[in-house]
Regions:
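A structural signal for short, well-ordered beta-strand segments
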Residues: 33-36, 70-72, 143-147
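Conserved double-stranded beta-helix
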Residues: 93-98, 102-122, 126-127, 132-210
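Short, well-ordered beta-to-alpha junction loops that form the rim of enzyme active sites
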Residues: 34-36, 89, 125-127
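Non-heme Fe(II)-dependent double-stranded beta-helix
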Residues: 1-59
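Catalytic core of non-heme Fe(II) oxygenases with the double-stranded beta-helix
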Residues: 43-113, 153-162
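Short, hydrophobic/aromatic alpha-helical segments in well-folded domains
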Residues: 6, 19, 69-73, 130
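A structural signal for short, well-ordered beta-strand segments and their strand-loop junctions
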Residues: 30-33, 85-86, 122-123
Length: 210
């Protein structure tokens, strides 16, 4: 995001936010991470894992969950090209991969995440999942976007990582300000958020990357 505005709209994509509200149980959450994953031919296989630690809240009534992750398929996800496998219902157990005898082995309840390019799949950070081996001749690519409860630390502290020019760009529009709020950058004590803040020239090489 410090390079340009290409990803500015990702944290405020309405359907992703609605999914986060539904799973987390309210609006007290923020953007946790954004990353890409490319699985070249012959690679991409992972052991089953969750994206968060044990969750005793899953056993409460009603259950409590810490967040969501999502996959935007930049390539088709097929049976042959290493599509993600997910263990249906695992998020309700409160356990992680530590409960498995062999996280690398097939699981009887696993299902494949399949779809054409452009498909978005949203899932709990507590569900077991993993990439599988890409047996096709082309790289399989996707974007992961995650939202977590606000009391959980971010993968990258967005407020500290944002370059001055990124703050200035986001401050120009209502959507940009909304993006900053979801990213956890709405601290009124941050001098960069003042309307009269002057951006000092800063070489791109010194700007931290989000």
């Amino acid at each position: 995001m410090n390079d340009d505005g290409f990803f500015d709209a990702v944290p405020v994509q309405p359907k992703l936010l609605a999914a986060a509200v539904h799973v987390i149980g309210g609006s007290d959450f923020r953007w946790f991470s954004l990353n890409t994953r490319g699985s070249p031919p012959g690679l991409g296989e992972q052991a089953l894992h969750t994206d968060h630690g044990p969750n005793p809240g899953a056993l409460e009534t009603p259950p409590r969950y810490s967040g969501i992750n999502s996959v935007l398929m930049l390539s088709p996800f097929t049976e042959q090209n290493g599509s993600t496998r997910m263990v249906s219902g695992w998020h309700r157990t409160g356990d992680t991969q530590e409960a498995l005898a062999d996280p690398s082995a097939p699981h009887p309840d696993e299902q494949r995440m399949l779809g054409p390019a452009g498909t978005v799949v949203v899932f709990s950070v507590h569900i077991l999942h993993s990439g599988t081996r890409n047996d096709s001749e082309q790289t399989r690519s996707c974007i992961h976007t995650s939202f977590m409860r606000r009391d959980r630390p971010q993968q990258v502290n967005q407020r500290e990582a944002a370059a001055p020019q990124t703050i200035a760009r986001l401050m120009r529009t209502a959507k940009g300000r909304a993006t900053m709020a979801v990213m956890g950058m709405q601290d009124e004590d941050d001098p960069r958020l003042r309307d009269d803040y002057t951006i000092n020239d800063q070489p791109d090489s010194e700007a931290p990357r989000l």
